[in-house]
Protein backbone atom coordinates (compact mmCIF):
# COMPACT_ATOMS: atom_id res chain seq x y z
CA UNK A 1 0.00 0.00 0.00
CA UNK A 2 1.36 3.43 -0.92
CA UNK A 3 2.42 5.63 1.97
CA UNK A 4 -0.28 8.23 1.25
CA UNK A 5 -3.05 5.62 1.16
CA UNK A 6 -1.73 3.97 4.32
CA UNK A 7 -1.69 7.29 6.18
CA UNK A 8 -5.19 8.15 4.96
CA UNK A 9 -6.50 4.79 6.12
CA UNK A 10 -4.72 5.10 9.47
CA UNK A 11 -6.51 8.40 10.10
CA UNK A 12 -9.87 6.64 10.00
CA UNK A 13 -11.46 6.55 13.43
CA UNK A 14 -9.51 9.56 14.70
CA UNK A 15 -11.50 12.73 15.35
CA UNK A 16 -9.03 15.50 14.56
CA UNK A 17 -11.05 17.98 16.62
CA UNK A 18 -11.19 15.81 19.75
CA UNK A 19 -8.77 15.70 22.67
CA UNK A 20 -8.31 12.09 23.81
CA UNK A 21 -7.27 10.82 27.25
CA UNK A 22 -3.61 9.82 27.02
CA UNK A 23 -4.32 6.10 27.49
CA UNK A 24 -6.76 6.12 24.57
CA UNK A 25 -4.43 8.21 22.41
CA UNK A 26 -1.52 5.82 22.97
CA UNK A 27 -3.73 2.82 22.19
CA UNK A 28 -4.85 4.43 18.92
CA UNK A 29 -1.28 5.28 17.93
CA UNK A 30 -0.06 1.74 18.69
CA UNK A 31 -2.89 0.20 16.64
CA UNK A 32 -1.83 2.28 13.64
CA UNK A 33 1.90 1.60 13.89
CA UNK A 34 1.84 -1.17 11.29
CA UNK A 35 5.17 -0.69 9.48
CA UNK A 36 7.59 -3.59 9.15
CA UNK A 37 9.99 -1.91 11.59
CA UNK A 38 9.41 -1.09 15.25
CA UNK A 39 8.16 2.49 14.96
CA UNK A 40 9.14 5.14 17.48
CA UNK A 41 6.29 6.68 19.47
CA UNK A 42 6.71 10.44 19.70
CA UNK A 43 5.21 13.30 21.66
CA UNK A 44 4.88 16.91 20.54
CA UNK A 45 4.11 19.62 23.09
CA UNK A 46 3.17 23.13 21.95
CA UNK A 47 4.31 25.58 24.61
CA UNK A 48 3.39 29.20 25.24
CA UNK A 49 6.97 30.42 24.89
CA UNK A 50 9.07 32.26 22.33
CA UNK A 51 12.53 30.64 22.39
CA UNK A 52 13.99 33.66 20.60
CA UNK A 53 13.99 35.27 24.05
CA UNK A 54 16.61 33.92 26.45
CA UNK A 55 14.19 33.95 29.40
CA UNK A 56 11.75 31.71 27.51
CA UNK A 57 14.11 28.89 26.54
CA UNK A 58 13.01 25.41 27.62
CA UNK A 59 15.50 22.57 27.76
CA UNK A 60 16.41 19.72 30.02
CA UNK A 61 17.00 16.00 30.35
CA UNK A 62 14.82 13.29 31.84
CA UNK A 63 15.32 9.57 32.38
CA UNK A 64 12.25 7.72 31.16
CA UNK A 65 11.11 4.99 33.59
CA UNK A 66 10.88 2.40 30.81
CA UNK A 67 13.73 3.56 28.58
CA UNK A 68 13.43 4.62 24.95
CA UNK A 69 13.96 1.32 23.18
CA UNK A 70 16.83 2.93 21.33
CA UNK A 71 20.51 2.22 21.85
CA UNK A 72 22.35 5.54 21.92
CA UNK A 73 25.96 5.86 20.88
CA UNK A 74 27.69 8.01 23.47
CA UNK A 75 30.80 10.07 22.84
CA UNK A 76 32.89 11.47 25.70
CA UNK A 77 35.56 14.15 25.62
CA UNK A 78 37.87 13.41 28.55
CA UNK A 79 41.45 12.67 29.48
CA UNK A 80 43.25 10.31 31.84
CA UNK A 81 41.25 8.71 34.63
CA UNK A 82 37.99 10.28 33.43
CA UNK A 83 38.53 8.82 29.96
CA UNK A 84 39.02 5.38 31.49
CA UNK A 85 35.92 5.92 33.65
CA UNK A 86 33.90 6.72 30.54
CA UNK A 87 35.12 3.61 28.74
CA UNK A 88 34.29 1.43 31.74
CA UNK A 89 30.78 2.90 31.87
CA UNK A 90 30.15 1.88 28.26
CA UNK A 91 30.94 4.98 26.20
CA UNK A 92 31.25 4.18 22.50
CA UNK A 93 33.83 6.84 21.64
CA UNK A 94 36.27 8.50 24.04
CA UNK A 95 38.98 11.00 23.23
CA UNK A 96 40.40 14.51 23.48
CA UNK A 97 42.26 16.34 20.70
CA UNK A 98 42.06 13.22 18.55
CA UNK A 99 38.27 13.08 18.86
CA UNK A 100 37.97 16.80 18.08
CA UNK A 101 39.95 16.24 14.87
CA UNK A 102 37.74 13.29 13.95
CA UNK A 103 34.57 15.35 14.38
CA UNK A 104 36.06 18.30 12.50
CA UNK A 105 36.82 15.85 9.70
CA UNK A 106 33.13 15.08 9.37
CA UNK A 107 32.84 11.84 11.33
CA UNK A 108 30.38 11.94 14.23
CA UNK A 109 30.15 8.41 15.59
CA UNK A 110 27.85 9.24 18.51
CA UNK A 111 24.31 10.41 19.24
CA UNK A 112 24.94 12.00 22.64
CA UNK A 113 27.99 14.04 23.60
CA UNK A 114 29.43 14.36 27.12
CA UNK A 115 32.49 16.31 28.26
CA UNK A 116 34.39 17.03 31.44
CA UNK A 117 34.55 20.77 32.29
CA UNK A 118 38.26 21.04 31.50
CA UNK A 119 37.60 19.83 27.96
CA UNK A 120 35.10 22.56 27.05
CA UNK A 121 37.64 25.07 25.65
CA UNK A 122 38.62 22.31 23.21
CA UNK A 123 35.07 21.10 22.54
CA UNK A 124 34.02 24.72 21.99
CA UNK A 125 35.76 24.57 18.62
CA UNK A 126 33.05 22.14 17.52
CA UNK A 127 30.17 24.53 18.18
CA UNK A 128 29.34 24.96 14.49
CA UNK A 129 29.28 21.19 14.01
CA UNK A 130 27.59 19.96 17.18
CA UNK A 131 25.41 23.01 17.90
CA UNK A 132 23.00 22.70 14.95
CA UNK A 133 22.57 19.01 15.81
CA UNK A 134 21.64 19.80 19.40
CA UNK A 135 24.64 17.80 20.59
CA UNK A 136 26.80 20.46 22.22
CA UNK A 137 27.58 19.49 25.85
CA UNK A 138 25.81 21.72 28.36
CA UNK A 139 26.11 21.79 32.18
CA UNK A 140 22.39 22.63 32.50
CA UNK A 141 21.43 19.22 31.18
CA UNK A 142 24.24 17.28 32.82
CA UNK A 143 26.40 16.66 29.76
CA UNK A 144 29.27 18.79 31.06
CA UNK A 145 30.19 16.95 34.22
CA UNK A 146 32.91 15.24 36.21
CA UNK A 147 30.52 12.33 36.78
CA UNK A 148 31.11 10.91 33.33
CA UNK A 149 30.17 7.40 34.42
CA UNK A 150 26.78 8.57 35.65
CA UNK A 151 26.17 10.61 32.49
CA UNK A 152 27.11 7.71 30.22
CA UNK A 153 24.93 5.24 32.12
CA UNK A 154 22.06 7.73 32.10
CA UNK A 155 22.29 8.18 28.34
CA UNK A 156 22.48 4.44 27.80
CA UNK A 157 19.67 3.81 30.28
CA UNK A 158 16.96 5.89 28.64
CA UNK A 159 17.62 9.56 29.34
CA UNK A 160 16.09 11.95 26.82
CA UNK A 161 17.24 15.49 26.11
CA UNK A 162 14.52 17.93 25.17
CA UNK A 163 14.72 21.44 23.81
CA UNK A 164 12.05 23.82 22.56
CA UNK A 165 12.24 24.57 18.84
CA UNK A 166 11.65 27.88 17.07
CA UNK A 167 7.89 27.37 16.83
CA UNK A 168 7.63 26.76 20.59
CA UNK A 169 7.38 22.98 20.22
CA UNK A 170 9.14 20.26 22.21
CA UNK A 171 9.33 16.93 20.37
CA UNK A 172 10.79 13.70 21.70
CA UNK A 173 10.66 9.95 21.25
CA UNK A 174 9.15 8.23 24.28
CA UNK A 175 9.47 4.57 23.32
CA UNK A 176 8.71 2.01 20.64
CA UNK A 177 5.45 0.65 19.26
CA UNK A 178 6.40 -2.71 20.76
CA UNK A 179 6.21 -1.23 24.27
CA UNK A 180 3.04 -1.90 26.24
CA UNK A 181 0.54 0.96 26.36
CA UNK A 182 1.10 1.23 30.11
CA UNK A 183 4.86 1.73 29.71
CA UNK A 184 4.36 4.34 27.01
CA UNK A 185 1.89 6.26 29.17
CA UNK A 186 4.38 6.22 32.05
CA UNK A 187 7.09 7.56 29.75
CA UNK A 188 4.83 10.29 28.36
CA UNK A 189 3.95 11.46 31.85
CA UNK A 190 7.61 11.47 32.92
CA UNK A 191 8.65 13.59 29.96
CA UNK A 192 5.68 15.96 30.23
CA UNK A 193 6.37 16.42 33.94
CA UNK A 194 10.00 17.31 33.20
CA UNK A 195 8.92 19.84 30.56
CA UNK A 196 6.41 21.34 33.01
CA UNK A 197 9.10 21.68 35.68
CA UNK A 198 11.38 23.38 33.14
CA UNK A 199 8.88 26.24 32.70
CA UNK A 200 10.97 29.40 32.24
CA UNK A 201 10.47 32.59 34.22
CA UNK A 202 9.56 34.50 31.08
CA UNK A 203 6.65 32.23 30.11
CA UNK A 204 3.29 34.02 30.12
CA UNK A 205 -0.26 32.74 29.80
CA UNK A 206 -0.95 29.04 29.30
CA UNK A 207 2.36 27.17 29.31
CA UNK A 208 1.36 23.77 27.87
CA UNK A 209 -1.07 24.62 25.09
CA UNK A 210 -1.37 21.43 23.06
CA UNK A 211 -0.12 17.85 23.23
CA UNK A 212 -0.18 15.20 20.52
CA UNK A 213 1.29 11.72 20.14
CA UNK A 214 2.13 9.81 16.98
CA UNK A 215 4.25 7.00 15.58
CA UNK A 216 7.02 7.39 13.00
CA UNK A 217 4.73 6.66 10.05
CA UNK A 218 1.34 7.29 11.61
CA UNK A 219 -1.02 10.22 12.16
CA UNK A 220 -1.01 12.44 15.22
CA UNK A 221 -3.62 12.05 17.94
CA UNK A 222 -4.44 15.09 20.06
CA UNK A 223 -4.28 14.57 23.82
CA UNK A 224 -6.21 16.08 26.70
CA UNK A 225 -3.40 17.80 28.68
CA UNK A 226 -5.07 17.15 32.02
CA UNK A 227 -4.64 13.38 31.55
CA UNK A 228 -0.88 13.83 31.17
CA UNK A 229 0.05 16.60 33.58
CA UNK A 230 -0.46 16.52 37.33
Swiss-Prot record:
GO biological process, one term: regulation of translation
UniProt keyword terms in alphabetical order: Repressor, Ribonucleoprotein, Ribosomal protein, RNA-binding, rRNA-binding, Translation regulation, tRNA-binding
Any one GO MF annotation of this record: structural constituent of ribosome
CDD domains given in the database record: Ribosomal_L1 (cd00403)
Keyword S-adenosyl-L-methionine: no
GO CC, any one term: cytosolic large ribosomal subunit
Keyword check for RNA-binding: yes
InterPro entries assigned: Ribosom_uL1_bac-type, Ribosomal_uL1, Ribosomal_uL1-like, Ribosomal_uL1/biogenesis, Ribosomal_uL1_3-a/b-sand, Ribosomal_uL1_CS
Subunit structure: Part of the 50S ribosomal subunit.
Similarity comment: Belongs to the universal ribosomal protein uL1 family.
Matches recorded under NCBIfam families: rplA_bact
Stated role: Binds directly to 23S rRNA. The L1 stalk is quite mobile in the ribosome, and is involved in E site tRNA release. Protein L1 is also a translational repressor protein, it controls the translation of the L11 operon by binding to its mRNA.
HAMAP family: Ribosomal_uL1_B
Protein name, entry field: Large ribosomal subunit protein uL1
The organism of origin for this protein: Nitrobacter winogradskyi (strain ATCC 25391 / DSM 10237 / CIP 104748 / NCIMB 11846 / Nb-255)
Amino acid sequence: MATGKRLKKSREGIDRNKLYPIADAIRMVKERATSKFDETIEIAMNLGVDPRHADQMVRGVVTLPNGTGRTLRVGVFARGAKAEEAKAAGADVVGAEDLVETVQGGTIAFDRCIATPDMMPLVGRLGKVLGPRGMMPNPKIGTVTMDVAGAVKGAKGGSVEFRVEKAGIVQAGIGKASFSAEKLVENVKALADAVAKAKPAGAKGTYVQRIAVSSTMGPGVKVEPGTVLG
